[in-house]
């Protein structure tokens, strides 16, 4: 499997978890296509909500795969590839150099102003409008473990 630049020095560990044949097929396809995937922990309650079908509680682990969106280009070129209103793992770096790693949805894409609106499921957390050029990678959450 192709390693993503953000995880070059990461330790790879084996993790047993239950998944159905649909997920098994996806994992096999990611391996064949050399698409990065992994299991990551979530911290905080921003994605916790009363809808238990989508809630991602604090301390959950999520299975994700790299959407392979070229985040080094202007949003106008890739806006149609970005899933909206679906849980994503988003990695980036602010204009001051602070790295971030968040589990959010992208509720809207503004290609004119080159920014996206990050949304939390928890209504106690405000939406955040960020420049698209802060984002370095976008991963789609496939399963909450």
Task: Describe the residue ranges of each PLM region.
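Coil-to-alpha-helix initiation sites in intrinsically disordered, low-complexity, charged segments
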Residues: 64-65, 100
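Glycine- and charge-enriched low-complexity intrinsically disordered segments
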Residues: 93-145
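Long alpha-helical scaffolds
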Residues: 82, 88-90, 94
């Amino acid at each position: 499997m192709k390693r993503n630049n953000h995880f070059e020095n990461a330790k790879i560990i084996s993790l047993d978890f239950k998944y159905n044949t649909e997920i098994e097929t996806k994992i096999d396809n990611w391996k064949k296509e050399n698409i990065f995937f992994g299991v990551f922990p979530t911290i905080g309650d921003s994605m916790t909500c009363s809808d238990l079908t989508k809630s991602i509680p604090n301390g959950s682990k999520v299975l994700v795969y790299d959407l392979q969106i070229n985040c080094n280009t202007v949003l106008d070129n890739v806006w149609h590839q970005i899933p909206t209103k679906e849980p994503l793992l988003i990695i980036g770096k602010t204009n001051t150099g602070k790295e971030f790693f968040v589990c959010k949805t992208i509720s809207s894409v503004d290609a004119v102003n080159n920014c996206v609106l990050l949304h939390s499921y928890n209504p106690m957390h405000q939406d955040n409008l960020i420049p698209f050029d802060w984002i370095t990678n976008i991963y789609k959450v496939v399963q909450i473990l």
